Amino acid sequence: MLAPGAPDHHNPFMEPITLSTERLLLRPFGPQDAEDTHAACQDPGIRRWTVVPSPYTRADAELFTGKLSPQGWADDTMYNFAVVLRESGALVGAVGVNSRVLTGTYEVGFWTAREHRGRGYTTEAVREAARWSFTDLAADRLEWRAEVGNVPSRAVALKAGFRMEGDQRSALFNKGTRRDVWIGALIPADLGLAGTHPYLPAPGVSATP
């Protein structure tokens, strides 16, 4: 029997879900988020370090919130959450969990609206999304990647418990060029959770941080 919200691979539709933390709600994006998403993505930092289009138009925001994000849930490949404040509903940012080629491996990505940075919101959201990935998606490995030099993203990943694993050359294609990336990963044991398959660390490699 599947845990509540876990994907049924005989029926690949993943029912959208809302996650909650002490200060935040992580809920699926919808058309109502287009205006705030468009405003947030005018920030040069988001356009520089993420793969969002630049310039970022209202049509881009409508496509992301109204079509691409819902479709990701429907085809069980991409789970984008709007991160909002519990008290006011204000959009703090986005956290997305995407499936990778290797079974049980997913990748997390995120951005934070400029006015909400420096308060720990994104770290809080990433931790919750990671826990959900392990318990509901049956993930055995959650990867984080960012272009080399994206220090704020790296700081969030480290605070969320990711272990840095090194650099990858030419591993990101962004705005017409290939870029080098930093890579880190989180596994269920890092959060005190059991994985879906046994994990045998290599000699000299600790299973947990």
Predicted segments, located by residue:
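Conserved GNAT-fold acetyl-CoA-binding loop/helix
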Residues: 47-67
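A short helix-loop-beta-strand connector motif used in the catalytic cores of GNAT acetyltransferases and
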Residues: 68-82
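Generic structural signal for well-ordered secondary structure
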Residues: 30, 39, 54-58, 76
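Hydrophobic residues in alpha-helical segments
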Residues: 41, 50, 72-73
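Generic detector of ordered secondary-structure context
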Residues: 67-68, 176
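Acyl-donor (CoA/ACP) binding surface of acyl/acetyltransferases
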Residues: 1-47, 80-209
